[in-house]
Design a protein with these regions (language model features):
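Low-complexity, intrinsically disordered/propeptide-like segments
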Residues: 12, 19, 133-135, 214
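DNA breakage-rejoining catalytic core of tyrosine-based enzymes
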Residues: 190-212
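Basic/aromatic DNA-contact patch characteristic of tyrosine site-specific recombinases
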Residues: 1-76, 82, 93-96, 100
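N-terminal core-binding DNA-recognition domain of tyrosine recombinases/integrases
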Residues: 45-59, 69-197, 216-219
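Basic, Lys/Arg- and aromatic-enriched nucleic-acid-binding interface segment
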Residues: 152, 209-236
Length: 236
């Protein structure tokens, strides 16, 4: 079964505050032609994002909108399970999804989510929830969507936004738990491999220089003899 195409869910903060869903026919169809929880979840997200837009910076709103939108699209179109029924295992599945999303959910640039046309706003066909960044000036390599992999920092930012979303819903008594907070502790993408870190040490030449200086200081002032003793002890 082919992966459903993703459609944008939320316009800019200014447009979202007083949104008229009739002006977004594709979005309206998605919410009306599916189970009733689609609409309620979208309204939860809208309420949360308006709260973020009112109290945080424009950058924070844009980042949270991206993450909440991805999560809701996965909930709607992939998992097909209400947010208040999701468990830790579901969230870990979402992490796997974000690690390797469907190719049709990946684009190469940042596009406007909605475009005006015929008196309404239509979802931009070039837009996708995930973006594969291409190095500037790299025109020799053909972009390969299958190589998309988010950094650990990107996944951490995603989890942070969704944790905040669930926390808001709990405070508003829409949800009773925060499965994302629990899942993050067991997410394999956040478990760091045990690595032997290079210990920074002075080279032999550097040590010799320090020792020579200490000797000179001790020769000129007996008060520095203790320093010479300590440095010599560290060296040996």
């Amino acid at each position: 079964m082919p992966t459903p195409l993703a459609v944008p869910l939320f316009p800019t903060y200014t447009e979202l505050k007083g949104i008229d869903l009739d002006a977004y026919p594709q979005l309206t169809d998605l919410l009306k032609q599916n189970e009733s929880w689609f609409k309620s979840h979208w309204l939860w997200a809208k309420e949360f994002l308006v709260y973020i837009g009112r109290n945080k910076s424009e950058h924070t709103f844009s980042r949270f909108r991206t993450e909440v939108e991805r999560f809701l699209l996965w909930t709607f179109l992939i998992k097909e399970k209400p947010m208040d029924e999701l468990r830790k295992s579901d969230i870990l599945e979402y992490a796997d999804f974000c690690w390797q999303p469907p190719l049709t959910w990946i684009c190469f640039a940042s596009y406007e989510k909605f475009l005006p046309g015929g008196g309404v706003y239509i979802g931009n066909k070039k837009w996708a929830p995930f973006r594969l960044k291409i190095a500037k000036g790299d025109s020799t390599t053909k972009p390969d969507k299958s190589k998309y992999r988010p950094s650990q920092e990107t996944l951490a930012a995603s989890f942070t936004a969704i944790i905040s979303f669930y926390t808001y819903l709990m405070n508003e008594e829409y949800c009773t738990g925060n499965p994302v907070l629990i899942a993050k502790k067991d997410c394999r993408y956040f478990i760091k491999d045990a690595q032997v870190k290079d210990i920074k040490r002075l080279t032999s030449d550097q040590w010799q220089h320090v020792l020579d200086v200490a000797v000179e200081l001790a020769d000129s002032d007996p008060n520095h003899e203790r320093s010479l003793f300590l440095i010599a002890a560290l060296k040996t």
